[in-house]
């Protein structure tokens, strides 16, 4: 039996009092008021309501060490990334590795593997696989249904997966950026209960009014807290907090859900509403076995210095102290490498793009060249735009134009030696060099963007040599971070991954980019379910039209 004194924050009765909690056999057996001189605060542990652990570039047991240091006791996680690479074997790896740490990880069953039929993935989870996985007790919900056109148009395979979730009594998560009106009503009517993709305030309000729970996302690239935070006080019972995709440097240097508690208070939000969104709502919505600082609950709680600075002093899970005084108190176990990578190196000829016959015509533009469709990246958002722009041509080859910030981008399958697909992108900002990654949502093929063809080829070939990872630099000077688990995650300690990743980000900035998170932004430029224009391993894709389009536009 152990006792802990402090100022207890009771979010249910919306009060704070000096008291003591008594813990025995992993449970809180008593919460009582008691006078003492301890000025530290005791609160329920925090919950990330939607996260892809793979985006931390660390395996679950390593991610857990970063999370508990920020007061997180549980996460609701979609193993969608590794499932696209390794299928059910990848999901099983995540389940087993998560057992090496005390962090409570609630995995779901990925609903869209692959995300679309328009790209190459390492696996397919059809209705039979999804139904089999949903029957498992350690898989707790149907993960984000990204194929919202399939829901609205009632594609049989999509509807069968939703029906399977209902049959097994599992919650269904949503993914519907920008969906409004009648289509939204149909989407919600299919039993989909959440959305973490809102980037406009009115969109989020409409979804809440129709019965959805909104997860306010603040990750490394997609950052929606600034736009959506008023919802926390307006609809405290209908909002949760999540990171979705957060890189290791963000987790270590900025924080996890704890940073949103701090920012919310800076915005003048009610502390009890913040705790509700960060703890109570996800626990209740997903039915998590996570304590809420009540008698009889699991002893999952945190101790902080004060509510304003919200510095995490200690984290407890099931009554065990897992973090205290800057130290994680559980061991780091060895993790075996696992991967699927079948790609040979490419040559300079593979990334050359010669305009097809008819693309150069005097009547099309003032330069006599047809305009091309260019992806327009938006810093901090997953949604892209598109512009029609006259390309730069050298020696008959379409090339990057750093002066106008129009850069060549390539995507190539990691699963075969299929042809390299080529597009162009604006707002990356590289003046020289290239960046490349085998983290490329959602099928995790190889994606690269650069100022010259030579730089692109060298960074891509470094990834192929490493069988996955990220790389940045020029043809003469490259830095890399190998990711030996599925080309998505490292087995190194979180601090080391964060440090190396930080160095790669700094190198990218030296090459000219001003993006907040260049590798995270790059990773979403091949995600064919988020508008507007993206590049996959089978070609340029217009998400709004849900079809492939030619690089050269007919004006």
Swiss-Prot record:
Catalytic activity: adenine + H2O + H(+) = hypoxanthine + NH4(+)
EC id: 3.5.4.2
Enzyme class: hydrolase
Required co-factors: Mn(2+)
Keywords recorded for this protein, A-Z: Hydrolase, Manganese
Keyword Manganese applies: yes
Superkingdom of origin organism: Archaea
GO molecular function: adenine deaminase activity
Name of a matching Pfam family: Adenine_deam_C
GO terms under biological process: adenine catabolic process
Family classification: Belongs to the metallo-dependent hydrolases superfamily. Adenine deaminase family.
Protein name: Adenine deaminase
Species the sequence originates in: Methanosarcina mazei (strain ATCC BAA-159 / DSM 3647 / Goe1 / Go1 / JCM 11833 / OCM 88) (Methanosarcina frisia)
Gene name of the encoded protein: ade
């Amino acid at each position: 039996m152990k006792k802990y004194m402090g100022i207890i924050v009771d979010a249910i009765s919306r009060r704070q009092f000096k008291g003591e909690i008594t813990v025995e056999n992993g449970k809180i057996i008593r919460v009582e008021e008691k006078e003492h001189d301890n000025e530290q605060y005791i609160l329920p542990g925090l919950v990330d309501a939607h996260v892809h652990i793979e985006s931390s570039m660390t395996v679950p047991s390593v991610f857990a060490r970063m999370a508990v240091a920020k007061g997180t006791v549980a996460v609701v996680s979609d193993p969608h990334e590794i499932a696209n690479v390794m299928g059910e074997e990848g999901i099983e790896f995540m389940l087993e590795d998560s057992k090496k740490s005390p962090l409570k990880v609630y995995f779901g069953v990925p609903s869209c593997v692959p995300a679309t039929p328009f790209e190459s993935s390492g696996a397919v989870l059809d209705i039979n696989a999804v139904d089999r996985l949903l029957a498992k007790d350690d898989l707790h919900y149907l993960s984000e249904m990204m194929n919202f056109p399939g829901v609205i148009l009632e594609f049989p395979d999509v509807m069968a997966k939703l029906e399977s979730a209902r049959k097994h009594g599992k919650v269904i998560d949503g993914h519907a950026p920008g969906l409004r009106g009648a289509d939204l009503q149909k989407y919600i009517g299919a039993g989909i209960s959440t959305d973490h993709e809102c980037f406009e305030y009115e969109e989020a309000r409409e979804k809440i009014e129709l019965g959805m729970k909104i997860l306010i996302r603040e990750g490394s690239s997609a950052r929606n807290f600034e736009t959506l935070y008023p919802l926390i006080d307006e609809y405290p019972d209908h909002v949760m907090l999540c990171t979705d995709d957060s890189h290791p440097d963000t987790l270590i240097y900025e924080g996890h859900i704890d940073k949103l508690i701090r920012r919310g208070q800076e915005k003048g939000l009610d502390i009890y509403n913040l705790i509700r969104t960060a703890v109570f709502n996800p626990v209740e919505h997903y039915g998590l076995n996570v304590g809420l600082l009540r008698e009889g609950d699991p002893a999952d709680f945190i101790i902080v210095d004060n509510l304003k600075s919200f510095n995490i002093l200690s984290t407890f899970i099931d009554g065990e102290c897992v973090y205290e005084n800057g130290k994680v108190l559980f061991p780091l176990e060895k993790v075996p490498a696992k991967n699927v990578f079948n790609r040979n190196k490419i040559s300079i000829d593979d990334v050359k793009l010669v305009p097809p016959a008819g693309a150069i015509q005097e009547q099309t533009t003032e330069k006599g060249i047809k305009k091309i469709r260019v992806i327009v990246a938006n810093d901090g958002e997953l949604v892209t735009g598109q512009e029609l722009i006259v390309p730069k041509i050298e020696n008959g080859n379409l090339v990057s134009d750093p002066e106008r910030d129009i850069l060549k981008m390539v995507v190539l399958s990691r699963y075969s030696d299929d042809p390299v697909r080529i597009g162009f992108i604006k707002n990356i900002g590289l003046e020289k060099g290239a960046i490349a990654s085998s983290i490329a949502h959602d099928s995790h093929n190889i994606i690269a963007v650069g100022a010259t063809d030579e730089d692109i080829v060298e960074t891509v070939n470094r990834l192929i040599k490493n069988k996955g990872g990220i790389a940045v630099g020029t043809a003469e000077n490259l830095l890399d971070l190998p990711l030996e688990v599925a080309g998505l995650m490292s087995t190194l300690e979180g601090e080391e991954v964060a440090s190396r990743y930080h160095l790669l980000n700094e190198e990218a900035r030296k090459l000219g980019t001003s993006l907040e998170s260049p590798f995270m932004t790059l990773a979403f430029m091949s995600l064919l379910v988020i508008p507007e224009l993206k590049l996959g391993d089978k070609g340029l894709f217009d998400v709004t039209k849900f079809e492939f389009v030619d690089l050269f536009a007919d004006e």
